[in-house]
């Protein structure tokens, strides 16, 4: 057993709540805050002072530690040299066919869910859902654009269901647990070696959820409009992920874990993020339509930027 103060989900909900309260306490003009380039590595000393003043340096230091622990998890999972079930392997045609079939099936399933549940959505969510439907061919082509012959990185056994709720916090450090894989996947699919960016994407979607969940859980508490809070949410997400990537990438590269060249990493991250957001959308449409805005915004970021 690991002594702990709870999971990272609850810890980050508390942190993000304080960050949003600071918007009011310091009367911060969200529209004038500098925007980060999404999914670009960002050193802490390159974060604008106004962002540090708003969010707090300690928050970004926590994210650096979490990134390091995530990288160390992948380094260990990718270090096996004898057991072929765990040795790193390159991308190939079989994996490409498996992945594309899985993605297209899942995407078509989500399209059907959107069309059947449009009446449950309103305003911003409805607008983004209609935008998604109008761009379904573009999204489908993104999934089919997976060309394994251009990928030089390696696949490893990954966590498979990596999010803030799977991480315990103790003494400002993080402990990762529950390596069973994606609950909806078959055992055979869970054993398929994946790009490490699949776990990174899972954690990034969890950051996105934690930020928006904080807004939804405390709407009556903050003075800013929902639109302003959503804008702040995207800024916060951009800085969280940028700081995470800088530490994660430098750590795995120092250990010679092959996650591919820069353009390849970006492609794999966005591919896995799109996969994850579409997976989430089906759940939200069926269970919490008011929260469908979270995966819809994630999808919109990827297809419109």
Where are these regions (language model features)?
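Active-site-adjacent structural elements in folded domains
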Residues: 143-150, 259-267
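ATP/Mg2+ or Mg2+-diphosphate-binding catalytic cores
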Residues: 127, 231-257, 267-305
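An alpha-helical support segment within catalytic cores of ATP-dependent transferases
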Residues: 110-156
């Amino acid at each position: 057993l690991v002594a702990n103060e709870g999971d990272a989900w609850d810890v980050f909900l508390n942190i993000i709540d304080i960050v949003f309260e600071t918007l009011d306490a310091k009367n911060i003009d969200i529209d004038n805050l500098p925007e980060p380039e999404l999914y670009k590595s960002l050193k802490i000393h390159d974060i604008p002072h106004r962002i540090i003043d708003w969010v707090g340096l300690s928050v970004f230091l926590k994210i650096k530690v979490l990134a390091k622990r995530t990288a160390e998890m992948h380094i260990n999972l990718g270090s096996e040299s004898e057991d072929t079930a765990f040795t790193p392997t390159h991308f190939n045609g079989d994996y490409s066919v498996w992945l594309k079939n899985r993605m297209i099936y899942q995407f078509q399933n989500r399209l059907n869910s959107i069309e059947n549940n449009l009446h449950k959505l309103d305003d911003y969510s409805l607008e983004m859902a209609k935008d998604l439907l109008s761009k379904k061919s573009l999204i489908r082509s993104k999934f089919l654009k997976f060309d394994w012959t251009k990928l030089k990185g390696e696949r490893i056994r990954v966590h498979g269901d990596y999010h803030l709720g799977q991480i315990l916090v103790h003494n400002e450090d993080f402990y990762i647990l529950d390596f069973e894989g994606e609950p909806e996947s078959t055992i055979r699919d869970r054993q398929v070696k994946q790009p490490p960016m699949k776990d990174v994407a899972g954690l990034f979607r969890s950051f996105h959820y934690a930020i928006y969940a904080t807004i939804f859980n405390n709407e009556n508490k903050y003075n800013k409009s929902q639109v302003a809070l959503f804008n702040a949410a995207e800024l916060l997400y951009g800085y969280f992920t940028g700081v995470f990537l800088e530490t994660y990438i430098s750590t795995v590269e120092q250990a010679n874990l092959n996650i591919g060249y820069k353009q390849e990493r970006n492609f794999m991250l966005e591919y896995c993020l799109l996969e994850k957001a579409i997976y989430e959308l089906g759940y939200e449409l069926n269970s919490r339509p008011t929260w469908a805005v979270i995966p819809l915004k994630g999808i919109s970021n990827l297809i419109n930027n």
